Amino acid sequence: MSDLAREITPINIEEELKSSYLDYAMSVIVGRALPDVRDGLKPVHRRVLFAMNELGNDWNKPYKKSARVVGDVIGKYHPHGDSAVYDTIVRLAQDFSMRYMLVDGQGNFGSVDGDSAAAMRYTEVRMARISHELLADLDKETVDWVPNYDGTEMIPAVMPTKVPNLLVNGSSGIAVGMAWNIPPHNLTEIVNGCLALIENGNLTIDELMTYITGPDFPTGAIINGRAGIVQAYRTGRGSVYVRAKAEVEVDDKTSRETIIIVHELPYQVNKARLIEKIAELVKEKKVEGISALRDESDKDACRIVIEIKRGESGEIVLNNLYKHTQLQTTFGINMVALDNNQPKVMNLKDILDAFLLHRREVVTRRTVFELRKARDRAHILEGLAVALANIDPIIELIRHSDTPADAKAKLVARGWELGNVAAMLEKAGDDAARPEWLEPEFGIREGQYFLTEQQAQAILDLRLHKLTGLEHGKILEEYQSLLDLIAELLFILASPERLMEVIRDELLAVREQYGDERPPEISASSAEINIEDLITPEDVVVTLSHQGYVKYQPITDYEAQRRGGRGKSATRIKEENFVERLLVANTHDTILCFSTRGKVYWLKVYQLPEASRGARGRPIINLLPLEEGERITAILPVKEYADDKYVFFATADGTVKKTSLSAFSRPLSSGIRAINLKEGDELIGVDITDGSNEIMLFSDAGKVVRFNEGSAAPMQPMLMSSDDVDGDDESVIDAGNDDDGSDNGEGSESTESKGTFKGVRPMGRTAGGVRGIRLLNGDKVVSLIVPRGEGAILTATENGYGKGTALTEYPTKSRGTQGVRSIKVDEDGKVSIDQVDDTDQIMLITNGGTLVRTRVSEVSIIGRNTGGVRLIRTGEDETVVGLQRIAESYEEENDVMAIDGEVSEGTDTAPDAGSAAADPEE
């Protein structure tokens, strides 16, 4: 026990674990996982190709069963499972996995749909032609050899490849504690980069990138952006976006429907799973606008057809698919490889330099090998040439010898005349054909030639027909050609420039034989591409319904109608889903979407679904990250964010606020706070002002207050009727209880004396605002108007009556007052208001979804204290809920009569306030 105890050495378990783990990790990294930077092959790839080479499984020979190759690999070189080795062979034979296949397979080797290859007993393989370039000169001592796993065989430590395979075919995998992902490239470009580096070894990476533009994936597709490529080539790490090559076009069969055709997929994308994912997104309504999906691919080409619903934008649908599916993927580049048996992150130039250094070593070792072989052969031919020059005495010597050994000894023992050899060696040099192992006493000495035993044996083995004059000439000719070859080989070894010329010529031969001209297609990055460039600018009508459905329609969908017509249906509306917001914008405009919780979101008009008049559109909650219970209440089109412009807010409770437009110039996908609202309050209007505009607030009780948003100014006198006062002296400024809603100290107003106006100074985004109008009896503000020009104010009641009133009829007063009467309404009636010009047109929308477009010139201009005329015929339980001005530029050239409706020809004067709103004809 004591002897045994002395043999046990205590060690620290932490140190032992660390040491053992590092040994294991390096064993896996070097011996199993990482590719070598010189040949770009992992050990299993190298062993597969070597086994096929040893089997004579060449590209120009018959195929052999895959099982035969797998058996040789696992039996001699790679002691792992047969399935792992077969999977390696399968991948080397897949044209969608390898840019340049190294194995030529026959049978089912899988597909881009993820189908598995047939069992190895069914498939057959042989080396691809390009694989010979990886194994070329393997038998010329160009690389080191190492024992196999059991020491019974020798295998190459690296292949003497003529092809820069690491970049050409790429590599990916995971080792212990590290991973790598090197993309494939176009062989022509990589060779061109090598040639440029041979010409000028001081080229920078940026200069190399003029030859090597980027990865070239076997499945094609488009590399979206150069920034990731530049970063990866400079540092060894980066990422690129790979986008499917797709086209949006008109279906040839229908000549009307829009379709998306996908021709090429990103690298390593499973086509079947991609199609399943698209179908799943359509089913879950995460991607809308797709009516049909078909896979029309065959064995030669990929073709996925996506049919687009009528009215939807194919470009928008395609971009949504890029966002939500593997039609666009990220390829992370991590160029890690073994360099001198050490894992190393390498940039583009590092890899090319390592390959060229490997080629210099291979060509040098090959040249040394060929020089040795040439000298050995020339040494024999030199002896034969000397023998032929001394043929008679040599024959006489052989005839008088007792045994072959005696004849050999006599041939070696004396010197012989040089004959023709003297002239040949005088030109090439006495030692040109002298092997390194030759002792000094042999060869030319003192004007004679002393034969070696090898030469003497070759003379004795010479057949008699070689003594003819023709054969004599052939021996001398071969000897001379070997002398020339030796001179060339010596020149290669002596001249680095000539050595690089040899490498250059071999690279040119590889490019000529295997190169192709398909360059990687690299587009501008998504940040550089403006989707607006794909969208035709046009004026459209944007609608937002009560239940949150949004859409846009071309303005040309609505023809002008005579007033009193029933209009044309603008959307498929249920009773509870009437249109709440309607505006006219350009497809390139930005829509600021203001929510019930005082937040603002950004949308481009073209991001909204284009829908027909009968379609509901799409829930805006699918376009914006709205929280539960949050609803969009106001939308505002914006072209640019000027510093001298302001966003003016008005709420239903009469609060107003203005904030610089530039405060909303930085869109966030999650939205930002635009205004703090009191509980129960909501936005009813938002507009753009210049800081000194007139502001008009209209209540649902038919009242209006007009004030200047800027600094104080003297009050204008005005005449008022008894109807204007309505129980209070509304000309008196309400100076008390300003109800400052600001939560951050901004926007508070001091009490001001009578006879001055109170403006609205700019406030921060989170301010609550100040009072704009004093409301009575639960009234609500229904409209915010910023008067521009000399146009009239068009007012419409929910019963379909309306009128135009000149702006001069509305006096400028101070904010915070009750205002003056704008229109007579029923006790429970509501109104809609907008400013118009005589050349404009208006749209009226009802809660039943009916929309009518009529000319402003057909609406009477009358005073404030009147009820108006019939604008739209409403049905039973149908009320007007929206009014929108359409500028002169949208007006139709032709005077189009009412469509899908009737024109009232009876009395068109509104009934007195308080009476029934029925049509007098009824």
Swiss-Prot record:
This is DNA gyrase subunit A. It comes from Aeromonas salmonicida. One of its GO terms (molecular function) is ATP binding. Gene3D superfamilies: 3.30.1360.40, DNA gyrase/topoisomerase IV, subunit A, C-terminal (2.120.10.90), Topoisomerase II, domain 5 (3.90.199.10), Topoisomerase, domain 3 (1.10.268.10). GO terms for cellular component: chromosome; cytoplasm; DNA topoisomerase type II (double strand cut, ATP-hydrolyzing) complex. InterPro entries: GyrA (IPR005743), GyrA/parC_rep (IPR006691), Gyrase/topoIV_suA_C (IPR035516), Topo_IIA-like_dom_sf (IPR013760), Topo_IIA_A/C_ab (IPR013758), Topo_IIA_A_a_sf (IPR013757), Topo_IIA_dom_A (IPR002205), Type_II_DNA_Topoisomerases (IPR050220). HAMAP family: GyrA (MF_01897). It comes from the Bacteria. The gene is gyrA. Belongs to the type II topoisomerase GyrA/ParC subunit family. Transmembrane segments: none annotated. Its EC number is 5.6.2.2. The active site is at Y122. It is an enzyme of class 5 (isomerase). A type II topoisomerase that negatively supercoils closed circular double-stranded (ds) DNA in an ATP-dependent manner to modulate DNA topology and maintain chromosomes in an underwound state. Negative supercoiling favors strand separation, and DNA replication, transcription, recombination and repair, all of which involve strand separation. Also able to catalyze the interconversion of other topological isomers of dsDNA rings, including catenanes and knotted rings. Type II topoisomerases break and join 2 DNA strands simultaneously in an ATP-dependent manner. PROSITE patterns: TOPO_IIA. Residues 715-763, 899-922 are annotated as: Disordered. SUPFAM superfamilies: GyrA/ParC C-terminal domain-like (SSF101904), Type II DNA topoisomerase (SSF56719). The lineage of its organism: Bacteria, Pseudomonadati, Pseudomonadota, Gammaproteobacteria, Aeromonadales. Residues 723-743 have a biased composition (Acidic residues). Few gyrases are as efficient as E.coli at forming negative supercoils. Not all organisms have 2 type II topoisomerases; in organisms with a single type II topoisomerase this enzyme also has to decatenate newly replicated chromosomes. GO terms for biological process: DNA topological change; DNA-templated DNA replication. It catalyses: ATP-dependent breakage, passage and rejoining of double-stranded DNA.
